[in-house]
Amino acid sequence: MSTEQMGTYEKIYFALWELGQRYGNFVQFRVIGRSHDDRMIPMLEIGKGDTCIICLSGVESGDRNLPEYLLSIAKDYCRSYESNWTIGESYEVRKLLDKVRICMIPMLNPDSYEICEYGYGAIHNPIHRQMLKMQDRPVEEYECNARGIDLRRNFPTNYYQRKRVNQEPASENETRALISIFQELSLIHIS
């Protein structure tokens, strides 16, 4: 996918919201939290089942293409459910999504996504913006949130290692939002 084809945070957010509005009888759009730079973290639930499959991307900017791909997959599932399509010879989308839900979180870390797209100037908070500029890290290589924390290493595990003063496991809004979803939903698979 070329850079011209990629969506901005706002485009992806509103495309997910529109899917929730259009297919409201089997799709739910919701905000699961806010980033440290006050961007909303969207999630789209497709299907009616109690058990949930979570599809997660956008944890860091290296996932640059994945949010757009998840959005495309979400659109395909919505159209397939509404039209009662069968994929291949035996994959009945409606039958599947009446038993399980696919919960898509295409952009857990919208701040990193925006930094990669627009540079450190995309950060609204002047203190965070200046702190990030002082790290002298190229925006193309940036993988953290607006506070400079790598979310991949912010989960409370037995192997957690503190990298900075005042950094604790699950110290970040984005991490806490995902943990909250894990605790709320009955999961069968995380991809």
Model-flagged regions — what are they?
Residues 1-37:
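Short glycine- and acidic-rich boundary segments immediately preceding or forming the N-terminal edge
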Residues 2-4, 59-60, 163-168:
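Second-shell loop/turn segments in exported
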Residues 39-43, 148:
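Short glycine-rich loop/turn motifs
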Residues 43-50:
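Short beta-strand-to-loop junctions in surface cap/lid or active-site-entrance loops
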Residues 50, 64-188:
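Active-site/substrate-binding loop(s) of hydrolase catalytic cores
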Residues 52-55:
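Conserved beta-strand elements of the Class I
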Residues 58-60, 189-191:
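Histidine-centered divalent metal-coordination motifs
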